[in-house]
Amino acid sequence: MPINSERLAHTFEALVQCDSVSRSEGRFAGQLQARLEALGVATLFDRSAPRTGSDTGNLVGRRAGTIDKAPLLFSAHMDTVQPGVGIRPVFEDGIFRSAGDT
């Protein structure tokens, strides 16, 4: 299946622009959850938020596979470091970069 570069770039821009500074990544987590569920992935949040001081727990997604295929695990951070609010991505010469003010 070919990659839809335009859709991928649009998705990347939308996610980068969602503020997600450490312990305040709940809005980003909600966006990610909606995107995963739209792809048929069952999601849940664990109860780690009170222990970490975050406004959200870890997002866990699971999609049933088949016996004849190897399982796949994907793990990533949802938070960014300061300054991570108001990030404006710029796409130039086939490369994304920050506008330089964050």
Placement of each model-derived feature along the sequence:
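Intrinsically disordered, low-complexity segments enriched in polar/charged residues with Gly/Pro
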Residues: 1-2, 46-48, 74-76
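Intrinsically disordered, low-complexity regions enriched in small/polar residues
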Residues: 14, 30, 46-47, 93, ...
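A non-catalytic alpha/beta surface segment that caps or lines the substrate-entry region
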Residues: 20-68
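Short, functionally important structural connectors and interaction interfaces within domains
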Residues: 7-13, 51, 70-73, 81
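Active-site metal-coordination/substrate-binding segment of hydrolases
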Residues: 35, 55, 62, 68-102
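N-terminal capping segment at the start of a domain
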Residues: 1-26
